[in-house]
């Protein structure tokens, strides 16, 4: 079993101001600080030949392409994880949509777990860049 824990953050910007779609067009800076609240991701290989994904919904599918959750689907594709015998669970200390960067924490934690499953060693800056790219792709599919 793989477990990741990613901190939530308080930012004096927020609302996507830390994403390339915003900062490439507008100048400025962002001040943020991690807090002691977290997003947890667990990955567990199972004996069931299906992909089980638990977040605010439950998905049971045969292939990655069948996943409804755009960030999970695109992260799995990006890392090259397609195993049908996998269970992914997401939990958080605070609900999403609170302005505490939960989508970024979720995405980085998920990518870290998927890379660990593949035994990939990824530099934190590369992980952050990949998470940013995945969030952009995920938002385009919503």
Language-model features and meaning:
Residues 123-127:
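FAD-binding glycine-rich core of flavoenzymes that anchor FAD
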Residues 128-135:
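Intrinsically disordered, low-complexity acidic/Ser/Thr-rich segments used as protein-protein interaction/activation
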Residues 103:
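Phosphate-binding site recognition
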Residues 109:
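Active-site signature of alpha/beta-hydrolase-fold catalytic machinery across serine-
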Residues 140-142:
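Conserved small/polar residues in nucleotide/adenosyl-binding loops
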Residues 1-100, 112-122, 133:
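ATP-binding N-lobe of GHMP and related small-molecule kinases
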């Amino acid at each position: 079993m793989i477990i990741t824990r990613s901190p939530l953050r308080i930012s004096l910007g927020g609302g996507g101001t830390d994403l390339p779609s915003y900062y490439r067009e507008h100048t400025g800076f962002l001040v943020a600080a991690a807090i002691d609240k977290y997003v947890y991701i667990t990955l567990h290989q199972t004996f069931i030949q299906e992909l089980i994904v638990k977040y605010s919904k439950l998905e049971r599918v045969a292939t990655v392409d069948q996943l409804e959750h755009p960030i999970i689907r695109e992260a799995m594709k990006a890392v090259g994880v397609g195993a049908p015998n996998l269970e992914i669970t997401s939990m958080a200390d605070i609900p999403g949509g609170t302005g505490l960067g939960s989508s970024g924490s979720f995405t980085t934690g998920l990518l870290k777990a998927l890379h660990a499953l593949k035994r990939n060693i990824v530099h934190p800056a590369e992980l952050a860049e990949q998470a940013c790219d995945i969030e952009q792709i995920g938002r385009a599919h919503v």
